[in-house]
Amino acid sequence: MKTPYTKYLIIIIALIGFNCGSNTAATTQTKTPAPFNLITEKQFNDLFPQRKPFYTYAAFIKAVHDLSQIKVKVTRRGISFYQYIRTDKTTGKSVTVREDQDFNADWNKKKPESIYIVDYADFCMAKDAQTNKKELAAFFANVAHETRNGSIGTYDDGLMYIHEIDTSNAYLAPNDVYPATKGKKYYGRGPIQLSYNGNYGRASDFIFGDKKVLLNDPKMIETDPVVAFETAIWFWMTPETDKPSAHDVMIGKWQPNATDKAEGRTPGFGMTINIINGPVECNKGDDVKPMNDRMGFYQFFLKQFGATDLNCACSCGKMMPYYY
């Protein structure tokens, strides 16, 4: 485990409060992100009283801070040709970390193009205090469910697994851009239980600017708690093909198109479940234990944060999942 990040925590604790909607501490002149003051160390520990010692408040805060220095411009042409330009805000340097073969081919330049900016400084900091609290409650609810080791209906047992119990499955999938490294396994690791070589490689591109870091050393997610939390935040903040990010859903940025509406997808917490584990938990009615467990955690954490979601579309029971 890494040593505590004392210096950084002193700064954070001095500024702690629930006023996370205020970004006055950050200025465009210094480009310093506002301190993540949505949750105190005591509150974090109270939410996860049985957590593994691996999962510390210090590691979570450092992951939030470090990722806030990264912004990625995602350009998609056609269905599946991508370019990622990663900017390190501390240096101002931008580097193309992914550009698919034929991305700039003449025939491909004629394809429809979409551009999306992923700014990790927006994690639970993009809106007013109440919206930010709801987003953090939703993030922690999904994390707690993924890593719980207790009885359904109790909400004190999140962050108890660093990796999934059964590590015999390597979770390998054909991927030309992010091929698996020989002999490595990509089973679920970290707070969001990141799985498959494609996700490991893509997360590595965004977090490190080098896909090989996590493809070659997937165990880093279970040995470095900061990286573990970074992968969870990455998954939360980053859209995939036509699937929006959970972040955009919770801040109200994502709105369903005609296809989404026809397939029952609506803004709200239920959509985050669809994004994370839709094929297993969604479009199967409302009597699905994992889905209801996530919903229970969400309502529990909202209460702890002094927030409400009165019009919560919490269920994904009638939503078609994404199959990619």
Protein language model regions, located:
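Bacterial Sec-dependent N-terminal signal peptides
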Residues: 1-28
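Extracellular low-complexity, O-glycosylation-prone Ser/Thr/Pro/Gly-rich "stalks"
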Residues: 24-44, 48, 256-324
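Peptidoglycan-targeting cell-wall enzymes and recognition modules
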Residues: 26-238, 264-268, 272-275, 280
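Short, flexible/disordered secondary-structure transition segments
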Residues: 150, 154, 243, 309-312
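Short clusters of hydrophobic/aromatic residues that line enzyme substrate/ligand-binding pockets
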Residues: 250
